[in-house]
């Protein structure tokens, strides 16, 4: 009888700690930098389409998070003395895709002092209030499409242009 109870106890423990196969997520590894290097003491805010908000405080520039599939999430990268950067994620993926490719994200924040020193700072600030990137899964390339790189290049060109 003791053996049966012990067996049932272990069986229950294994089922309690095992992960449900239906739960899939996108693993995002990111590094947050500015013009001078990696940033520390960051706030990363996850804002979900249903209004749920999760806030992460991290001391290091490198961090990872997991977002469940079939979610639409806005990530905000916040650091004192820098303009907040927003990146939107659409984690809709085909059901037949069992192994999700992870995603590496490099986020470059702009210093508030730099933004305040340019001529068109109001226009730049308005532009920065919108998501600077949209990441979604591309079934044709079977990888994540990242428009954030093009937005960052455009912002950097506008900043350089204002100094000429």
Language-model regions, residue ranges each:
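Short, acidic Ser/Thr/Gly-rich low-complexity loop/linker segments typical of extracellular
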Residues: 50-62
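Short Pro-Gly-centered beta-turn/loop motif in secreted/extracellular proteins
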Residues: 64-74, 80
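A short, solvent-exposed loop/turn motif at the edges and junctions
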Residues: 78-92
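Conserved, compact domain cores that house catalytic/ligand-binding motifs in diverse enzymes
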Residues: 124-164
